[in-house]
């Protein structure tokens, strides 16, 4: 039976895959965005998101656990100091995959994988979208309330005549 065998091996041995994901995670933490194939990005997302969750709690144990996966002092300090503070209130979903099309040589699906809170363009768009948003139902309710007194006043004038 194939229970619990759903895992993309990426055509590599276990040690090669672990080393590749570790290097890609360090690059993602340092540069905040990397360009890679979609399959590698999806594997990297499953690898790096638990590490980012661990970095929210800055203890010696969590630093050692993360360092055992990354093996890069600069990436670990960047993760625990800068990134953990910026995503402290986010409950998950720290990465975003943006598909960019296929590679010319072998037609492999390519994409960007980036940390969500570090894309300035999307942060500006969400801030701009949130400001002018109003609710229609309240405007209709106030408009109907404003019309009601005028109708009552008109009926009172007719009764007075």
Swiss-Prot record:
One of its GO terms (biological process) is translation. Residues 142-153 have a biased composition (Low complexity). Residues 130-141 have a biased composition (Basic residues). Keywords: Ribonucleoprotein, Ribosomal protein. One of its GO terms (cellular component) is cytosolic large ribosomal subunit. Residues 126-161 are annotated as: Disordered. One of its GO terms (molecular function) is structural constituent of ribosome. The keyword Oxidoreductase does not apply. The keyword Nucleus does not apply. PANTHER family: LARGE RIBOSOMAL SUBUNIT PROTEIN BL17M, RIBOSOMAL PROTEIN L17. Belongs to the bacterial ribosomal protein bL17 family. Part of the 50S ribosomal subunit. Contacts protein L32. This is Large ribosomal subunit protein bL17. It comes from Parabacteroides distasonis (strain ATCC 8503 / DSM 20701 / CIP 104284 / JCM 5825 / NCTC 11152).
């Amino acid at each position: 039976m194939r229970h619990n065998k759903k895992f993309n091996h990426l055509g590599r041995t276990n040690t090669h895959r672990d080393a590749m994901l570790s290097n890609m995670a360090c690059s993602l933490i340092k540069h905040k965005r990397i360009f890679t194939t979609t399959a590698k990005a999806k594997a990297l997302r499953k690898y790096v998101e638990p590490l980012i969750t661990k970095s929210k709690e800055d203890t010696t144990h969590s630093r050692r656990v993360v360092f055992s996966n990354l093996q890069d002092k600069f990436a670990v300090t960047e993760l625990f100091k800068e990134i953990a503070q910026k995503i402290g209130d986010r409950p998950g979903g720290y990465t975003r995959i943006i598909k960019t099309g296929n590679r010319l040589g072998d037609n492999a699906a390519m994409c960007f994988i980036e940390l969500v809170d570090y894309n300035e363009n999307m942060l500006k768009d969400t801030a701009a979208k949130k400001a002018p948003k109003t609710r229609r139902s309240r405007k209709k309710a106030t408009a109907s309330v404003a019309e009601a007194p005028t109708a009552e006043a008109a009926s009172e004038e007719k009764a007075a005549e």
